[in-house]
Amino acid sequence: MNHAGMLALVKKRKRPVEAGAQGQVEVKFKEVTLELVERKMGSSRRNFLTRLARSKGFRVEDVLSDDVTHVVAEDNQAEVLWAWLMGHGLRDVSRLALLDISWFTDSMREGRPVRVETRHSIQNTPTGTDCSPPTAVANVSQYACQRRTTTENHNNKIFTDVMEELAESSEFNESKGPCLAFRQAASVLKSLPSAVHCLKAIQGLPCLGEHTKAVMEEILTFGRSFKVEEIRCDERYQALKLFTSVFGVGPKTAEKWYRRGLRSLQEILTEPNIQLNRMQRAGFLYYSDISKAVSKAEAKAVGCIIEDTFHWIAPDAILALTGGFRRGKEYGHDVDFLLTMPEIGKDEGLLLHVIDRLKDQGILLYCDYQGSTFDVSKLPSCRFEDMDCFQKCFLILRLEQGQVEGERGLQRDPGDSRGWRAVRVDLVAPPVDRYAFALLGWTGSRFGRDLRTFAQKERQMLLDNHALYDKTKKLCLLATTEEDIFTHLGLEYVEPWQRNA
């Protein structure tokens, strides 16, 4: 492979626009105007954050005025800030959102103004701290499949973000126990209907061990986790996180590259002894696109392409959007679809026809097809595998600007003049009699993993993407819908949008 020729794929950073030069950058979010408080932040850091925000399409004022909607401060006492605001003679201070720097950080990471949560707001007067449990302890199950978690009730993001970073670090260190513990803790905290203000509020809640509680106590006391800040500065963690952001690169490959002394994507591309596989080459080739989040509008546009293609081949075909978008998420890393035919056997070779049609349309940038190895005679499987045996393909498609509805259109970098972007798409085609199990599994999140654990430990059943096997009756249970599976397990049905565990 000609690595040198791929260097052009890794773009050089553009020189940032100086503070005070908002006119040089397009303002994407006209409903939001920021003011960064220099006190405690310092002028150099304020200038840097101003340039960063403007580069992402935010309007930032240099002087506080009535045009400002969001005031962002760092390490300031609430009463001092509010006194400072009152002294500026603004028409209506009550309409301002006075926010901690964490809101700004979250917004920069997402590339858009995130929803203001309680943890972001700097309140004028303390309202008192509620240390009662956020919900009856008896109602919080140890199993995510018995909890309802939407995208709206994540009131403890200050904790769950830290837990997920600690879990990721543990995964890089191949520490399976701590990794699982932190992810279970994050899942429980996500399900709570209100914010946790003290440790007394979580007494009796499941999956919150002493290590987790110690981390939460540190956050409650200092507003941050020093362990996570240490991890973020760790060279190995930074390298592995960067390398695994490339499509086709897992933790083991990332670790191997790190041990060879590589620290950047450029170094990987210029290292003559590294042989990238086909998926990894595509990952580098389209890195600037597929490392960005996919919006719901983009997922909908991809859905129209897949639906039109699929129904052109088979008008009676069955198609479902799965993954995070089925759970109601606004953004995701890729777009997943389940495809099948109403008659058993008609699904054979289905994806190959879809792939050929996408090629004919000139929008197929990459394809990795895997044929079916599903064998009903080998059911049940006593060990769950992360990847099922159905035919599937991992694609990268070209999505045009005109195909995406809404004002924002495609997710692109400022200055990107292309009228298209690359999007990752996964297609899975199970037989119709396995469709319900595959749909449940591919909807994803910890909910599905805990559902399998619940089935085995509480019901003596084996559940995976292929079947539900009753070990007592020694037979596979039939299901044509997800509701059927919940009924077999003796569980209340949980809607997809309530499965964001």
Swiss-Prot record:
Listed SUPFAM superfamilies: BRCT domain, DNA polymerase beta, N-terminal domain-like, Nucleotidyltransferase, PsbU/PolX domain-like
Required cofactor names: Mg(2+)
Binding site for Mg(2+): D334, D336, D426
EC number from the UniProt entry: 2.7.7.31
Catalytic activity reported: DNA(n) + a 2'-deoxyribonucleoside 5'-triphosphate = DNA(n+1) + diphosphate
Record-linked Gene3D superfamilies: 5' to 3' exonuclease, C-terminal subdomain, Beta Polymerase, domain 2, BRCT domain, DNA polymerase beta, N-terminal domain-like, DNA polymerase, thumb domain
Similarity field: Belongs to the DNA polymerase type-X family.
Protein name, as recorded: DNA nucleotidylexotransferase
Record organism: Oncorhynchus mykiss
Name of the gene encoding the protein in the UniProt record: dntt
